[in-house]
Amino acid sequence: MAKLSNEELLDAFKEMTLIELSEFVKQFEETFDVSAAAPVAVAAAGAPAAGGEAAPAEEEKDEFDVILESAGDKKIQVIKEVRGLTSLGLKDAKDLVESAPKPVLEKAKKEDAEKAKEALEAAGATVTLK
């Protein structure tokens, strides 16, 4: 069988009905022993299992928002750190620092969030992780 290009495969899929595509996906999953389920659905399914227990959910949290609560006395140093942590320009970083409390990083990995918090606090800022 000749190898099909991505465009040829997409053209073939465009001609199929939803039922035919659904059957194709099932057969593909069985043949290659994979799942086409979105990883988000797995994470969302795990959330209700935690129930009302907030403490264990916080321990397992792997994404954090770094919130700048205040710049403190060394505003220029904090602006420099914000620019170093983000891709913001000087004006945008200054506006962010002056309008605190504001998120500096969103959905950052735990290690990155902690490093950012330490750097901002070393520059004189007050920071929280959420």
Swiss-Prot record:
One of the GO biological process terms? translation
Q: Say if the entry is tagged with keyword Nucleotide-binding.
A: no
Please give the GO cellular component terms listed in this UniProt entry: cytosolic large ribosomal subunit
Judging by the UniProt lineage, the source's domain of life is Bacteria
User: Could you give a GO molecular-function term held by this entry?
Assistant: structural constituent of ribosome
Enumerate the UniProt keywords alphabetically. Ribonucleoprotein, Ribosomal protein
Main role?
Forms part of the ribosomal stalk which helps the ribosome interact with GTP-bound translation factors. Is thus essential for accurate translation.
The annotated subunit structure for this chain is: Homodimer. Part of the ribosomal stalk of the 50S ribosomal subunit. Forms a multimeric L10(L12)X complex, where L10 forms an elongated spine to which 2 to 4 L12 dimers bind in a sequential fashion. Binds GTP-bound translation factors.
Which HAMAP family does the UniProt record give?
Ribosomal_bL12
Family under the similarity heading = Belongs to the bacterial ribosomal protein bL12 family.
Q: Which protein are we looking at?
A: Large ribosomal subunit protein bL12
Species source reads: Cutibacterium acnes (strain DSM 16379 / KPA171202)
